């Protein structure tokens, strides 16, 4: 039912209030808002020219409808044009009906830049936000790259492309080596698995003792013993290659094969053999203990250091299996068995990689190679191109001199040695043209190798400092937080750690909001 308000007639208590569809003669048009619009009235829930009150992370401002109407595609522009309160609530995080204020749980610093955008139509990059956080905020408020000012657009695009590797050029940045809280949280989550496990408290202590050399005095002693065994195994392998041991074992092997017996029982020196058995027993103890104490079996087999431990003992057991398989097939098969055993013995060299568990530098080197595959690929490409070019030139200049440059593939060795500036001197050019080609090859190698090596070195420095910082953070966390867990009940669950993690994140968000710019006593109009 349509009701009209006539001049001189007061209907203050009449509900619902409605919009006057046709202005009276002699009166200016005025729009009134219905407090309780009916379902069929089609009346807007707020005036179209009403200022928009917003609260972004504690910063309160008022934006005029005229400023928002210039950018109807943005989030605030769509909020201003919302036809109903339900539609408006979908665009904000909360709405205060009493104050008619919209709340957004977003970065307050970016919001101040957003206000500047509504005034000028240009968005400027904020140095206080990383490029990805800035992009997320811009996407949330409905701004694209076209909204960026011309003075900031090129810089933003450049930072977005170089941000993942920004520490390559500025590796001395303190924040670049700070350990990520998620990395420490992953360790805590792994240890939380012991809460529901059998003998979880004891297993947790033993696991920290074996995995973290700085956890306690027993862990330091265990690390020293492990390093000593690895070094003893490597020393025994090197001593075994000395000529006197080779001659003695070769004579014993010939006698054993002639007698139709396996040469494996007499080839090794008794002292070296006992030392090898002791090292194998220790390595097997380490692998089995870590497997039994690991919080997650799947993660155990995915860890590179654990795979190195398995490879270090695998040749010994493969040799035993080969001896059992061929032990009853006569002396003729012992020759084939010897070749297999030699291959397995060669795999013992991987034991030196066990030192990576106790060396921050080796772990940093592995991380560097893992994250430098692009640079390594570029280096190999440069070397391949240079070797191919200079090998062809050297072959053309030296093929008539009979000094080792007979074919282009034969010149590849010379090109590789020259470009890497090693210079063995086994093959050298003798003609003037060949020497000029060699000079160009050496100079080109210096330039080509130096370019990627600098980037790889910066990455190694970054990962080394980051690894040291992470170890210190985890060690401090172990001594403080994990000791509290150990002294408490064993019913520590992953859910409790997730709750604590969310609490810490909320605390960080609160700190961020507390750092927001101070707001004026009353909302300002834009």
From Swiss-Prot:
It comes from the Eukaryota. Residues 409-420, 421-428 dip into the membrane without crossing it. The keyword Transport applies. It is a multi-pass membrane protein. Residues 491-526 are annotated as: Disordered. The keyword DNA-binding does not apply. Keywords: Cell membrane, Ion channel, Ion transport, Membrane, Potassium, Potassium channel, Potassium transport, Transmembrane, Transmembrane helix, Transport, Voltage-gated channel. GO terms for molecular function: delayed rectifier potassium channel activity; potassium channel regulator activity. Disulfide bonds: none annotated. A motif (Selectivity filter) lies at residues 421-426. One of its GO terms (biological process) is potassium ion transport. The chain crosses the membrane at residues 218-239, 271-293, 305-322, 338-358, 374-395, 436-464. Residues 499-511 have a biased composition (Basic and acidic residues). Pfam families: BTB_2 (PF02214), Ion_trans (PF00520). It is found in: Cell membrane. Residues 1-217, 294-304, 359-373, 465-526 are cytoplasmic. SUPFAM superfamilies: POZ domain (SSF54695), Voltage-gated potassium channels (SSF81324). Residues 240-270, 323-337, 396-408, 429-435 are extracellular. Heterotetramer with KCNB1. Heterotetramer with KCNB2. Does not form homomultimers. Belongs to the potassium channel family. S (TC 1.A.1.2) subfamily. Kv9.1/KCNS1 sub-subfamily. PANTHER family: POTASSIUM VOLTAGE-GATED CHANNEL SUBFAMILY S MEMBER 1, VOLTAGE-GATED POTASSIUM CHANNEL. The transmembrane segment S4 functions as a voltage-sensor and is characterized by a series of positively charged amino acids at every third position. Channel opening and closing is effected by a conformation change that affects the position and orientation of the voltage-sensor paddle formed by S3 and S4 within the membrane. A transmembrane electric field that is positive inside would push the positively charged S4 segment outwards, thereby opening the pore, while a field that is negative inside would pull the S4 segment inwards and close the pore. Potassium channel regulatory subunit that modulate the delayed rectifier voltage-gated potassium channel activity of KCNB1 and KCNB2 by altering their kinetics, expression levels, and shifting the half-inactivation potential to more polarized values. While it does not form functional channels on its own, it can form functional heterotetrameric channels with KCNB1 and KCNB2. Each regulatory subunit has unique regulatory properties that can lead to extensive inhibition, significant changes in kinetics, and/or substantial shifts in the voltage dependencies of the inactivation process. This is Delayed-rectifier potassium channel regulatory subunit KCNS1. It comes from Pongo abelii (Sumatran orangutan). The gene is KCNS1.
């Amino acid at each position: 039912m349509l009701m009209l308000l006539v001049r001189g007639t007061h209907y203050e208590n009449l509900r619902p209030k409605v919009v006057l569809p046709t202005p009276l003669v002699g009166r200016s048009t005025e729009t009134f808002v219905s407090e309780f619009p009916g379902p069929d009235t089609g009346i807007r829930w707020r005036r179209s020219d009403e200022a928009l009150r917003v609260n972004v992370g504690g910063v309160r401002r008022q934006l005029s409808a005229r400023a928002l109407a210039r950018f109807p595609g943005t989030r605030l522009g769509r909020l201003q044009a919302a036809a109903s309160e339900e539609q408006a609530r979908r665009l904000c995080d909360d709405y205060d009906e009493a104050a008619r204020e919209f709340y957004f749980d977003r970065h307050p610093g970016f919001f101040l830049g957003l206000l500047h955008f509504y005034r000028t139509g240009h968005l400027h990059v904020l140095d206080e936000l990383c490029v990805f956080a800035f992009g997320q905020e811009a996407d949330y408020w409905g701004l694209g790259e076209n909204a960026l000012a011309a003075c900031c657009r090129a810089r933003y695009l450049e930072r977005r492309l170089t941000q993942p590797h920004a520490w390559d050029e500025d590796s001395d940045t303190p924040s670049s080596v700070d350990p990520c809280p998620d990395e420490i949280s992953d360790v805590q989550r792994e240890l939380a698995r012991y809460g529901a496990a059998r003998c979880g408290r004891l297993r947790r202590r033993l696991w920290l003792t074996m995995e973290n050399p700085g956890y306690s005095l027993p862990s330091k002693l265990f690390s020293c013993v492990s390093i000593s065994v690895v070094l003893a195994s490597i020393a025994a392998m090197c001593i075994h290659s000395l000529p006197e041991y080779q001659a003695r074992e070769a004579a014993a092997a010939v006698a054993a094969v002639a007698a139709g017996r396996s040469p494996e029982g007499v080839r090794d020196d008794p002292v070296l053999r006992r030392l090898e058995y002791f090292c194998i027993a220790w390595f097997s103890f380490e692998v089995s203990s870590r497997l039994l104490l690991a919080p997650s079996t799947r993660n155990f087999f995915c860890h590179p250091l654990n795979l190195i431990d398995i490879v270090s003992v695998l040749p010994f057991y493969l040799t035993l299996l080969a001896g059992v398989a061929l032990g009853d097939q006569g002396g003729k098969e012992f020759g084939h068995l010897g070749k297999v055993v030699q291959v397995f013995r060669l795999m013992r060299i991987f034991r030196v990689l066990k030192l990576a568990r106790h060396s921050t530098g080796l772990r940093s080197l592995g991380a560097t190679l893992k994250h430098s595959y692009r640079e390594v690929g570029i280096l190999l490409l440069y070397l391949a191109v240079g070797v191919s070019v200079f090998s062809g030139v050297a072959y053309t200049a030296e093929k008539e001199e009979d000094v080792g440059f007979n074919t282009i593939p034969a010149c590849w060795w010379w090109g590789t040695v020259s470009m890497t500036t090693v210079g063995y001197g086994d093959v050298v050019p003798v003609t003037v043209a060949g020497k000029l080609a060699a000079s160009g090859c050496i100079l080109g190698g210096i330039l080509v190798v130096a370019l990627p090596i600098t980037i790889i070195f910066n990455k190694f420095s970054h990962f080394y400092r980051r690894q040291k910082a992470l170890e210190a953070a985890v060690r401090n966390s172990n001594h403080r937080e994990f000791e509290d867990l150990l002294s408490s009940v064993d019913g520590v669950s992953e859910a409790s750690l997730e709750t604590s993690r969310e609490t810490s994140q909320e605390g960080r968000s609160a700190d961020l909001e507390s750092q927001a710019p101070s707001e004026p006593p009353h909302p300002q109009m834009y």
